[in-house]
Amino acid sequence: MAKLVATRYASAIFEVGVELNKEEMFYEELKIISSNFEENEKFFKMLKTPILSKQEKKELIENIYKDKASLEIVNFLKVLIDKDRISIIREIVDIYKQLLNENKNEIQAIAITAVPMSEESLKELTYKLCEKTKKNVKVKNQVDPTVLGGVLVKMGNEEIDGTVKTKLEKLKKQLHQIIA
């Protein structure tokens, strides 16, 4: 439910950004504001609490961000406060980034490996993913020793699991079925 709501808000502000040719700028502003909220938990809690009126919260947003963000983003934050949706700002920013990538025909991918990938391996994986998806894929390497070996690629809702850990788990399951 929260993802659906966040998608609606992200889509709405993204459309405005596209119309004004400010979609990149809007993303940067939203990302910074969301980070500010995460870094300053007391302030973020204050924006979510019913103790302050919506008008007081909007005045706070106006005073803090009027010189740091575009009028459209400040007004967007005020709408989130009016609709009691400021708490999903992180989800909105994440979905906005996906919309921005789709608009630029880009996909973000995470390659999870047991050890850091070499530059050559990363380039080869990027090339293969670009070929597979017919999109411009940006791959980031994340190290997780629990995968043991191989690679787990996450792109949006899709996962390509070529890890040793998963192969061992499948083998274990097959052996249990044979023995049982």
Swiss-Prot record:
Q: Keywords in UniProt for this one?
A: ATP synthesis, Cell membrane, CF(1), Hydrogen ion transport, Ion transport, Membrane, Sodium, Sodium transport, Transport
Its quaternary structure? F-type ATPases have 2 components, F(1) - the catalytic core - and F(0) - the membrane proton channel. F(1) has five subunits: alpha(3), beta(3), gamma(1), delta(1), epsilon(1). F(0) has three main subunits: a(1), b(2) and c(10-14). The alpha and beta chains form an alternating ring which encloses part of the gamma chain. F(1) is attached to F(0) by a central stalk formed by the gamma and epsilon chains, while a peripheral stalk is formed by the delta and b chains.
The name under which this protein is listed is ATP synthase subunit delta, sodium ion specific
**Out of the domains of life, which is the source?**
Bacteria
The protein's GO terms of the molecular function aspect are: proton-transporting ATP synthase activity, rotational mechanism
- Xref: PANTHER family: ATP SYNTHASE DELTA CHAIN
As for family, the record states: Belongs to the ATPase delta chain family.
Q: What's a Pfam family in this record?
A: OSCP
Which PROSITE patterns does the record associate with it? ATPASE_DELTA (PS00389)
Q: Which GO terms describe its biological process?
A: sodium ion transport
A further note on this protein reads: The ATPase of C.paradoxum is of special interest because it uses sodium ions instead of protons as the physiological coupling ion.
Q: Outline what the protein does.
A: F(1)F(0) ATP synthase produces ATP from ADP in the presence of a proton or sodium gradient. F-type ATPases consist of two structural domains, F(1) containing the extramembraneous catalytic core and F(0) containing the membrane proton channel, linked together by a central stalk and a peripheral stalk. During catalysis, ATP synthesis in the catalytic domain of F(1) is coupled via a rotary mechanism of the central stalk subunits to proton translocation. This protein is part of the stalk that links CF(0) to CF(1). It either transmits conformational changes from CF(0) to CF(1) or is implicated in proton conduction.
